[in-house]
Amino acid sequence: MAEQGTERGALRALLPVLDAHRAMTVRTFVAALADQAALVALVTLTAHTVGTAVVERQAPGPVTITALLVLVAARALATWREMDLSHDLAYRVLAELRVRVFDGLARSAPARIQGRRSGDLASAALGDVEALEFFYAHAVAQLLASGVVFGGGSVALALLEPWLLLPVLPVAALLALAPLLESRGRAVRGARTRAAAADLSAEAVETVDGLRELLAFGALDARRERLRAHGRALGEAQRSEQAWEADAAAVRDLLVVVAVVGVVLAAAHTVAGAWAPAAMALALGVLAPVADSAAALGQAGGLRAAAARVGAAVRAPAGAPAPAAPRPLPAGPLGVRLRGVRFDYGDRAVLDGLDLTVRPGETLALVGVSGAGKSTCAHLLARFWDPSSGAVELVPASGPPVDLRDLAEPDLRGTVSVVGQDAPLFHGTLAENLRLAAPDADAAAFAEAARVAGVDRIAAELPDGYGTRVGERGTTLSGGQRARIALARALLTRPRVLVLDETTANLDTEGDAAVSAALTEGAHLRTTVVVAHRPSTIRRADRVAVLESGRVVQTGTWAELVAEGGAFARVLARRG
């Protein structure tokens, strides 16, 4: 029920986006008002002209003909202008919404996107936003204009032939009420369509990403059948939605027919002569915008699910809120301290009062069995999340520690770099991927980072060197090459704290040793935390910390921990 309540107000919640486009919204309203008013005036004058010619056998004079021509031209111009302005407004708003959705996802990442399929996220960022085009282009300004035209036309009709309002007002009330009565059924069908579209999008993206594996294991036929099933589900949802719209349109048409019959019967007893056709045309003309508005409101009701998804993304809370008063960081090397840190994923506790200190310039290996919380520590150091309790601090050589929560985003990202095992590459050149974090880095810094990570040798083997396109997610490169590029990208920012989350896991022993040896250059100027499983990587660290059950249970050098045994020995035993 709470979800339904959220969807019920979802479209209304997206109206404030128009605040930044007030001038264009007003112009769109004026154009829609001119369009609808010109139509009512044209229909009424045409009916009066025909009535005069038939009843009084009097041909229209030059003034009437001129007025008709002016109204035709005005209607054509107003229609064109309204369509131009309304779609211009809608696409500007959609462009802004896409940015807001992306900002919301980025602000709440990775908590909000963890476990969600990339196709589903793409559907929210693109498909759901695109679906709202109808709402902004055909509903908002047009509804306001319809209300003004109906009100003005009703006043005019009351002054000329008030009896004709008797059939018009009840039908107008029913037309206005119809979208409210059908809103729940339409919203359910609209939500089903959007969910089916998101599922199909997610399946398609996963199929393309895993095409090689599907071919290798002979699973493509089964996957193709899954895509067909999702396609059928989407088709059925769309047919159900269209059938509902057809039924709603039939009800609206029936109400208009009732109004026509009522107006004809009322006019037969109250209006005589050449004014009869004009009075009936005016009565039905003021009803037409109401019928169009009812249709627009009905269709907009089917967009509530899309609006709710977009609104949820736009208003997503920050996973790591910005500080009200950011603190500056002192110059020089920085150590790291996790003090009494607790963290959980929902109802699953991962870290339970963890305490860990890494001295400035030290390289510490973080080890433990799978699920011990090593990667969670890396994510907390990057402030992808904040701890449930406790603090993650940067500790200068002299002076008080600085909580990550007190750092401005640019200062944090320029100080701490995290490289994961599967750091993604983008569909661009090798150079563009390297410069992602430091686009203004000079040539010397670029060359140095590439040399340290061994990317210069990768570039030498590529057809266009650093100008070679690496493909989406770096699919043209090996896992080891991608790891080296991700490492070089991080080094290019010249971080004072470097966190390697199994970065060299995809490298062979020789490659791992080469990267580790390269990282010793300038190691005293930065603090390095290495999440590792490979014994050779652990052995090269200055110190080792062993995690078990969400806490640090052992610390020391390789030799000290080997001699001590305990949890460290159990970790090594599992690695063979």
What are these regions (language model features)?
Residues 52-57, 156-168, 247-308, 313-317:
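Helix-loop-helix
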Residues 1-39, 60-64, 86, 131, ...:
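Membrane-integrated ABC transporters
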Residues 15-24, 110, 129-136, 140, ...:
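An intracellular "coupling" helix at the cytosolic face of ABC transporter transmembrane type-1 domains
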Residues 20, 25-33, 48, 141-192, ...:
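Transmembrane helices of ABC transporter permease
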Residues 86-103, 141-144, 167-212, 219, ...:
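Cytoplasmic coupling helices
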Residues 19-78, 163, 397:
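Transmembrane helix-loop-helix hairpins at lipid-water interfaces of multipass membrane proteins
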Residues 376, 414-417, 433, 449-453, ...:
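ABC-family ATPase nucleotide-binding domain "signature/switch" substructure
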